[in-house]
């Protein structure tokens, strides 16, 4: 299987012939990027480090935990207005001009075949050549859902990415920026 979910650790693992891509839903519901590199069967959650970050913002749900900051954690799909001051993947604005989306894990689905992008150029695969992982992140206050789509063609060594943004409310939202991916990699100095 190219896509594996470990419900105990809440880790998604995507395997190709030579690479592994891993993400984890943390205890607060944020989707964190763990690993992308040479193929491994190990759980890479040990790469997450928590240190006192007294001057970094943290989500309200973190309470007084100064070791939890989105500015220091490798988010899979970071958005503006959550205390992460690095490059973002998403910036939306509601009709009142508020630019913020606090995206938390809502659901996921693993299915056979690769997702389709109607009217856009894309990699195509037969039903038995690929698997799709769809992860839904949502902000109930901003009334927006972000559907992260991962297409895994294991034998071809390909992982594709796409994003669908859904307005779940009645008000208008403006998409100021939307990227298919934001790969957060630690620098090695």
Model-predicted segments: where are they?
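N-terminal accessory beta-strand-rich subdomains and adjacent acidic, glycine-rich linkers
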Residues: 1-189
């Amino acid at each position: 299987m190219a896509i594996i979910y470990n419900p105990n650790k809440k880790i998604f693992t995507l395997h190709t012939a030579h690479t592994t891509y891993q993400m984890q839903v943390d205890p607060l519901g944020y989707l964190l990027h763990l690993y992308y590199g040479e193929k491994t069967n190990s759980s890479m959650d040990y790469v997450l480090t928590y240190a006192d970050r007294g001057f970094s913002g943290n989500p309200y749900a973190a309470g007084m935990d100064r070791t939890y900051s989105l500015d220091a954690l490798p988010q899979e799909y970071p958005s503006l207005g959550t205390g992460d001051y690095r490059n973002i993947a998403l910036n939306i604005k509601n009709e009142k001009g508020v630019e913020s989306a606090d995206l938390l894990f809502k659901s996921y689905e693993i299915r056979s075949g690769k997702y389709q992008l109607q009217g856009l150029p894309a990699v195509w695969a037969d039903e038995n050549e690929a698997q799709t992982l769809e992860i839904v992140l949502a902000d109930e206050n901003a009334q927006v859902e972000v559907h992260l789509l991962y297409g895994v063609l294991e034998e071809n060594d390909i992982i594709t990415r796409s994003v669908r943004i859904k307005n779940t409310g009645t008000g208008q939202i403006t998409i100021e920026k939307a990227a298919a991916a934001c790969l957060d990699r630690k620098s090695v100095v």
